[in-house]
């Protein structure tokens, strides 16, 4: 029995959920998201709640049950509140700037690195060493944040690089003479 899957997904006021076969569409004040649920999982709407249940009793169906419930809950949260990820640039001369809707990063390379914002994701640069990524799709926000971090991940000796806000970088001791 999935402890996550058996919880109902609450639908707040102002959010409209449409079920068309296995496709769930969620409309809210921030936008619209759509996702096709695996065939092993059944979706029912009862009042202001969405209930999910496995159609068959297999290991895959149970796994997809919890996953589907979490993804639908993330869709509802995304269209009401949205998701945000913060990145910090640590290092001498490391800075970020907006270039239209794209992000221009100076990360110690001989050239600037430009990152285009995918659909539904926006960048903000409150300080030169801070990047805020916002959007309604949790996967898209997390994926672009990971992509930016991968350009120059924090190194263990000095801690320089792009890191998530609040991330603790495990430091190593340098070689001894």
Swiss-Prot record:
GO terms for cellular component: cytosolic large ribosomal subunit. GO terms for molecular function: rRNA binding; structural constituent of ribosome. GO terms for biological process: cytoplasmic translation. The keyword Ribosomal protein applies. InterPro entries: Ribosomal_uL6-like, Ribosomal_uL6-like_a/b-dom_sf, Ribosomal_uL6_a/b-dom, Ribosomal_uL6_bac-type, Ribosomal_uL6_CS. Keywords: Ribonucleoprotein, Ribosomal protein, RNA-binding, rRNA-binding. NCBIfam families: L6_bact (TIGR03654). Belongs to the universal ribosomal protein uL6 family. This protein binds to the 23S rRNA, and is important in its secondary structure. It is located near the subunit interface in the base of the L7/L12 stalk, and near the tRNA binding site of the peptidyltransferase center. Part of the 50S ribosomal subunit. This is Large ribosomal subunit protein uL6. The gene is rplF.
